[in-house]
Amino acid sequence: IIDYYDEGEEDRDVGVVDAR
């Protein structure tokens, strides 16, 4: 599942595979 969130921690677009 893909979680869309705009945290601004990683260097990728919004919508990572729950990689918090």
Curated annotation (Swiss-Prot):
Conversion of fibrinogen to fibrin is triggered by thrombin, which cleaves fibrinopeptides A and B from alpha and beta chains, and thus exposes the N-terminal polymerization sites responsible for the formation of the soft clot. Keywords: Adaptive immunity, Blood coagulation, Coiled coil, Disulfide bond, Hemostasis, Immunity, Innate immunity, Secreted. It is found in: Secreted. One of its GO terms (cellular component) is extracellular region. Residues 1-20 are annotated as: Disordered. GO terms for biological process: adaptive immune response; blood coagulation; innate immune response. Residues 1-12 have a biased composition (Acidic residues). A long coiled coil structure formed by 3 polypeptide chains connects the central nodule to the C-terminal domains (distal nodules). The long C-terminal ends of the alpha chains fold back, contributing a fourth strand to the coiled coil structure. Heterohexamer; disulfide linked. Contains 2 sets of 3 non-identical chains (alpha, beta and gamma). The 2 heterotrimers are in head to head conformation with the N-termini in a small central domain. Cleaved by the protease thrombin to yield monomers which, together with fibrinogen alpha (FGA) and fibrinogen gamma (FGG), polymerize to form an insoluble fibrin matrix. Fibrin has a major function in hemostasis as one of the primary components of blood clots. In addition, functions during the early stages of wound repair to stabilize the lesion and guide cell migration during re-epithelialization. Was originally thought to be essential for platelet aggregation, based on in vitro studies using anticoagulated blood. This is Fibrinogen beta chain. The gene is FGB.
